[in-house]
Amino acid sequence: NTGVSVENTAQELIATINIPYGTTATDVSIWGSNTTKTVEVYEMNIAANGKGSTVGTGTTNGSAISIGTVDSTTVNYLMIKISVSSTNHRIWGGVVTLTQN
């Protein structure tokens, strides 16, 4: 029983990831016990309200979700939102692919 899960199916799992200076984020991969759950990736801005801009969508099957080229700035970061439909669904982890500028 590793990974994270929700206590109520109305909840979502959220992760925020800094994009290190001098790098570009290009892909996100997420693994989970149910490989069909929806993953949404947003480029966020620390100086703005709301969810930001959607840069990619996919599922929890571990396949790379292309997010284009999200260059690091002084105000941006990534938010990954995973929607699950059961308290038994677990998210084991994920990776963000970075390239050096």
Predicted regions and their residues:
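Short proline/glycine-enriched turn/loop motifs at strand-loop junctions of beta-rich domains
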Residues: 23, 33-37
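C-terminal interaction-tip segments
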Residues: 14, 85-101
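Extracellular carbohydrate recognition and processing domains
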Residues: 50-72
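Short, surface-exposed beta-strand/strand-loop-strand elements in extracellular ectodomains
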Residues: 36-49
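Short edge beta-strand/loop segments characteristic of extracellular beta-sandwich folds
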Residues: 16, 29-31
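Extracellular beta-rich ligand/substrate-recognition surface
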Residues: 1-12
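Extended extracellular/luminal ectodomain segments enriched in beta-structured repeat modules
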Residues: 10, 19-27
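Noncatalytic modules at the cell exterior or secretory-pathway interfaces
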Residues: 69-92
